[in-house]
Every structure is written in C-alpha cells, then in structure tokens.
Amino acid sequence: MKELIEFMARAIVDYPDEVEVTEENTEDQIVFHLKVAESDMGKVIGKQGRIANAMRTLLKVAAIRKGTKASLEIG
C-alpha cells in the first residue's frame, strides 16, 4: 500500500524525488504519512480536496482487500 501512495503522488507532483511516505502501525489500522515539496502540496490536495479524497479512497479499497484499515495524512 505504501508503494501505491508513492506511485500516485509521484505521478502528479513536479518534484517526485521529494515524495516521502512513512508508515505507522496502530492497534486497529495503518496510518500513512505523505510528505511532498511545499510547492506540490496544492497538487496533491487538489481543488476542494478532490485529489486527496481520491487517494484516500483508493488506499481504503486496497486496505479492505488486505483485510485491514488504513488512513492517509498529508502534510
């Protein structure tokens, strides 16, 4: 799932080398933290958060297929 987030983020940013995804396991879910260049933050979030919501939806689908829960924090 980490690779999925990296792939999606690198496809839309201007500085793909600065994309960083970290993973934090909690008791009931996996929390992914996505960091991008300051100038790419708007592209990752999108108008009214549409890109961010789409990325979160795809992540949740992948997590359900693996039998777990996952969330994405962008910042």
Predicted regions and their residues:
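RNA-contacting regions in translation and RNA-metabolism proteins
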Residues: 1-43, 54-75
